[in-house]
Design a protein with these regions (language model features):
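Amphipathic alpha-helical segments
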Residues: 21-36
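C-terminal catalytic core of tyrosine-transesterase DNA break-rejoin enzymes
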Residues: 123
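Vicinal oxygen chelate
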Residues: 1-16, 32-85, 91-120, 131-135
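Residues at or immediately preceding the N-termini of alpha-helices
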Residues: 22, 89-90
Length: 135
């Protein structure tokens, strides 16, 4: 794994996903092409995993973190939606379905010219996978 600061720090911004099981959630995003570049602690059960896909970054963090750091409780509802572009929407949905992911909406060509499907990450957050329409 690389150092966490490959870019100048002032140029970085990324979403943080609060997860009940950090490693399981990271595996879901790794199936979408993200690569693990940082983990704390480095060995054992992680409380933080940094992922990259090209210039995009995401952090998967234990849902206990906000309460420990600033006394806020992470709720159980949808906390965000991730939108991820892939080379082949249908193939990606099939692979994630086979690995146990829940498909919320089957792939469909949208009016704005993309093919989009929605899945649920391991904590129930919606994740759109999008790409070119089927020709």
């Amino acid at each position: 794994m690389s150092r966490p600061y490959a870019l100048p720090i002032a140029e970085r911004a990324f979403p943080v996903v609060f997860a009940t099981h950090v490693a399981r959630s990271a595996s879901f995003y790794e199936a979408l092409g993200f690569e693990r570049h940082f983990q704390l602690p480095p060995e054992g059960e992680p409380g933080y995993i940094g992922l990259r896909r090209g210039a995009s970054e995401i952090a998967i963090v234990s849902a206990d973190w906000p309460e420990q750091q600033y006394r806020l409780h992470v709720g159980k509802g949808v906390r965000f939606e991730m939108f991820v572009y892939v080379d082949n929407v249908d193939r990606t949905v099939s692979q994630l379905r086979a690995s146990g992911s829940t498909v919320l909406r089957e792939p469909a060509d949208m009016a704005w010219g993309e093919r989009v499907a929605y899945l649920s990450d391991p904590d129930g957050n919606p994740v759109a996978v999008a790409g070119r329409p089927v020709e």
